[in-house]
């Protein structure tokens, strides 16, 4: 008995006691075929580069298959989520999927066993047709059962790891896709001259409606004025610019043209003493020159004589 326990026999193998096992563990030796191997024998057991490459290829192939499986499960989950987002009814008075009205005046309805919602017969699937009492499922619950069956979630009691497919822009089946808003192009700033002309034209249209009578009365005087170099009384803006495209607003006259020309001629005769000389800035607006009388050179005819005083002009 003792020989059997302590291993005195040559051919019998006896399990050593704990003390010997602890000692051999500290010495890094054990009861195996590799116990007395030399360093040379251990070096021969190293893997060659070809063997390492083959092992790495197997591991990489397993990883690729795992990624493909996760993508496959992700497509199933994405399809299920899309069906859940596209529901159109409330599941009570309307079909949960298509939104069709249910009841006496509408389509016949069935009751889903899993989600407890009402659907029409077109959107429902009969799960157990052979039984006396048929079992109905909506398409969403039927798809969910299919996902659990094809992904192995029924075995793991939950969905395994999956990878959702990437949403590419412009997909027709993506209801939440919206194109990015394009930024409006910046408008080129208008020049100061163009804006000034437009503002003047708008004011011109407004003023032309109210001052039509004044424009008509002053049109005869304006035709007699020279085209260039004539300015108004204040001298800040010309009557016509050199380009001829822009005109300053016209000032209306309260007195008739004939009466005004007479007043101006009287004032001119009072200042200069004679009516033959023109003012330094040219002829005044509204003043008409006539040929002098043959007998008296340099003097205006009697018809152009002004009234005695300026009070008659103001009256």
From Swiss-Prot:
Residues 184-193, 221-240 have a biased composition (Basic and acidic residues). It holds the Pfam family FYVE_2. Signal peptide: none annotated. GO terms for molecular function: cytoskeletal protein binding; small GTPase binding; zinc ion binding. Rab GTPase effector involved in the late steps of regulated exocytosis, both in endocrine and exocrine cells. Acts as a potential RAB3B effector protein in epithelial cells. Recruited to dense-core vesicles through specific interaction with RAB27A in endocrine cells. Interacts with RAB3A, RAB3B, RAB3C and RAB3D. Interacts with ZYX. This is Rab effector Noc2. It comes from Homo sapiens (Human). The gene is RPH3AL.
């Amino acid at each position: 008995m003792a020989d059997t326990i302590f291993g005195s026999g040559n051919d019998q193998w006896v399990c050593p006691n704990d003390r010997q096992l602890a000692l051999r563990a500290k010495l890094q030796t054990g009861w195996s075929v590799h116990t007395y191997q030399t360093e040379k024998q251990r070096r021969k057991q190293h893997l060659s580069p070809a063997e390492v490459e083959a092992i790495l290829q197997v591991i990489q192939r397993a990883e690729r298959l795992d990624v493909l499986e996760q993508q496959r499960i992700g497509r199933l989950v994405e399809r299920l989520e899309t069906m859940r987002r596209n529901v159109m009814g409330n599941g009570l008075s309307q079909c949960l999927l298509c939104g069709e009205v249910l009841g006496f005046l509408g389509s016949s309805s069935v009751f889903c066993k899993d989600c407890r919602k009402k659907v029409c017969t077109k959107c429902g699937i009969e799960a157990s047709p052979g039984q006396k009492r048929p079992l109905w499922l909506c398409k969403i619950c039927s798809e969910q059962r299919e996902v659990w069956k094809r992904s192995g979630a029924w075995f793991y009691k939950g969905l395994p790891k999956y990878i959702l497919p990437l949403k590419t822009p412009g997909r027709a089946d993506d209801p939440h896709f919206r194109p990015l808003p394009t930024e409006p192009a910046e408008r080129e700033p208008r020049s100061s001259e163009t804006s000034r002309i437009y503002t003047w034209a708008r004011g011109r249209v407004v003023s032309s409606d109210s001052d039509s009578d004044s424009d008509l009365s002053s049109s005869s005087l304006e035709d007699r004025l020279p085209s260039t170099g004539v300015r108004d009384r204040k001298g800040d803006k010309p009557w016509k610019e050199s380009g001829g495209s822009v005109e300053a607003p016209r000032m209306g006259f309260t007195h008739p043209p004939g009466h005004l020309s007479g007043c101006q001629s009287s004032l001119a005769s009072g200042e200069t003493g004679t009516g033959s000389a023109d003012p330094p800035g040219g002829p005044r607006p509204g003043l008409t020159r006539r040929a002098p009388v043959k007998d008296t050179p340099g003097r205006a005819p009697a018809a152009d004589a002004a009234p005695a005083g300026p009070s008659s002009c103001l009256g």
